[in-house]
Amino acid sequence: MKFIRNKQLLSRLLIADGIGRSGKTLLCHILTGFENVEKLEYYYFLEHLSLAHYHKKISDDMAVTLIKTQMDVQVFDQMNGRYINTRPDDYTGLNNYHSPNIYIERQNREEHSEPNYVGNPNATGIIGKIEMEKPIFLTFAHDLISRS
């Protein structure tokens, strides 16, 4: 059996990779200044999947499908205003992003459409926004490329 995810919400993922303390966070904060680049988030599952794939515990098609599926969940949740980090001392926190109001507005959205995605009344609007804006998701990893 081959695992395939034909539909995909997230079309652009940017990963800053390198050894620990090599300046990935600084680079990521610079990259957020570019158009459509979302605030920095750490998606730890990318490292877990990469490690499992490297040690041949999951197949190529399963690894790719899991990454696509999980990143689609992340883009939908972030564009819906979920799981926003408000800790002021955290480098992935909302206050360390140049435009925190974008994320606050997403949380306070009042528009509703017909439920079509797990009963979420904003689903159609969120999916349309993702397809129109094509956000670039930004994350970092620790030596991911060496385990790919």
Question: Predicted segments — roles?
Answer:
Residues 140-148:
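ATP-dependent NMP and nucleoside kinases share a basic, alpha-helical "lid"
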Residues 43-141:
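PAPS-dependent sulfation machinery
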Residues 22-37:
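A conserved segment at the C-terminal end of the G1
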Residues 16:
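Hydrophobic anchor at the beta1->P-loop junction of P-loop NTPases
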Residues 1-7:
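Pre-Walker A adenine-sensing motif
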Residues 19:
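Short, aromatic/basic-rich helix-turn unit that serves as a nucleic-acid recognition element
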Residues 10-13, 135:
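Pre-Walker A (Motif I) flank of P-loop NTPase domains
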